[in-house]
Amino acid sequence: MSEALKERKEMDPQYQWDLTKMYASDAEWEKAFAAIDPKIEALAAWEGKLNNAASIREFYDAEIGVFRELENLAVYTSLRLSEDTRADDAQSMDARATAKYVKAVGTIAYAQPEILALPQETLDAIMDDEQVAPYRFALEDLLRAKPHTLTAPEEKLLAAFGEAFGTPKNVADNLEDADMVFDSVKDGEGNDVELTASNYILLQTSNDRALRKNAFESYYKSFRQHINTLAASYSGAVKTAAAEASVRHYESSRAMSMAGENVPGQVYDNLVATVRKHLPDMYRYVALRKRILGVDELHYYDVYAPLTKGVSAHYTYDQAKQMVLDAVAPLGEEYGTIVRKGFAERWIDVFPNKGKSGGAYSGGSYDSNPYIMCNFTGTLDSVSTIAHEMGHSMHSWFSRHTQPAQYADYTLFVAEVASTVNENLLIEHLLAEKNQDPATRLALLNQYLENFKGTVYRQTMFAEFERDAHAMAERGEALNPAALNNLYKKLIVDYFGPELVVDDEVQYEWARIPHFYRPFYVYKYATGYSTAVALSEGILKNGEPAVKKYLEFLHMGGSAYPLDELRHAGVDLTTPAPVDAALDKFGRILDEAEACVAQLEAAK
């Protein structure tokens, strides 16, 4: 069914990203790396002097310059490492770049506490001085964190542990990407099929149930064999977050995480409560799967299976590019031109190869073009992934070409909005095609339903897992394999309902979710998707006025708080309304899917 993966050097370079635009070679990177130390050390010159507007402006200008260079160094090595996680040179470069970044953070650890220790009248005078105008919002944000900022020596000490704090994630990443081996599996005809981290989800979307079952069991067999290590690494990450929250005088690690973006806890709680209110529609979707697949028992290895047999379209990469371009056409000529530029100038690393990181992401630095890492396999989901990651990249492109470096990075809270708008525009574009037979339309509706399931329901389930795991640690309870497995299994039962048989392997799934090592990130997928539903519907229904507000949002970067940016785009997430409306749409799509099934059944 699937070809054996090639080594990277055997792949066609035209389908690989072009990193020479960052550094012509690793040797050029080494030169830049060797030159950074004196610049980092020079940042210490302002210690004890940040008591007036002129000094603060000079310091921030210098800091931005150094960290732009550090970002280039770190992004390049991260991209190189993604190409082949087994490569010793890339591992070494990435570790060195991380260490240098940690050194720089430690060097400037004095700055925030020094500014925050100033008398209020001095701070007021500084804020009113036009010399700090380019950094006024950043300073306002800093002053908001005053109760949670430590003394200069304490901040420096905490910064020194920065690299060590990343160890739990590094352990899990290296174990899963480089060391874990998955046994090959048999398909329904007895053929051997290679199983990798990159193709696991693809195999779960096969019409071959035996292949799905065998891949599911083999995949989680490896996680079961390493579950003690994975539980220990995750426990370490949770305890690290809890310790920092305590030291910084937050009531919890969740409060610390959300405070960084000025998002109140009610947004998180509204999400969970609203999604739980709509769980009956998820149970209806699970029941529809069971009905269509015609199985006596629906297992977890059935939840990604196509709802229509014989409708398993395969797309070439060229077709995928055109589909994305057609889908984003409503966003205007400039948007489409830049997407074409990305395709033509090799922003994208397209196909899987041995050692390549699984999944997909958009990266890059302020001074580089965006880069997209994906593992394209020709499915509709793969096409959707390109649309998704290009949405991230376009958000970055507009932000970096509009905002100064200090405001170019948008927050994680809004990070999934642009990507999901693109996904929704793609699926709406495909659904708008005329004269679709019920089977083809059902396949598209299934993709839409899967997007909702994966991005709203599933990510909210993850958010509950994360909330409860962190709360357990904060109560002093052990996060051992049994505790984490039981917590996750209960949530699977709650979210998928009575029609799903919960196999033993399901309880290990939490261990494969890398986002758990970025505390309280996953809920933003769900809020982002709900926002994207509102925005994409507005773009398609209202045209230019909605497009204008949306593109303005993409240009804002991190120049305002995320909830304010979304209000500018027309969505208020401090109320349950956007999530409610999104899941009402899920119900309507499900109604149409059920109607397609009825048509197909009547035609038999």
What annotation goes with each model-predicted range?
Residues Y371-N375, T402-L412, R441-N451, H470-M472, ...:
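Short beta-alpha connecting loops at secondary-structure transitions
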Residues I292-A327, G336, H395, L449-T455, ...:
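Long, K/E/R/D-enriched contiguous segments that form extended
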Residues L5, K9-M11, T20, A24, ...:
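C-terminal, non-catalytic "cap/extension" segments appended to globular domains
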Residues Y410-P438, Y448-E450, G454, G528:
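Post-HExxH zinc-binding segment in Zn-dependent metallohydrolases
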Residues G391-A405:
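Catalytic Zn2+-binding segment of zinc metalloproteases
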Residues A313-Y315, I348-S368:
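Catalytic zinc-binding patch centered on the HExxH motif and its immediate surroundings
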Residues M1-G310, C596-K604:
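A well-structured
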Residues A313, D367-A387:
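Short pre-active-site segment immediately N-terminal to the catalytic Zn-binding motif
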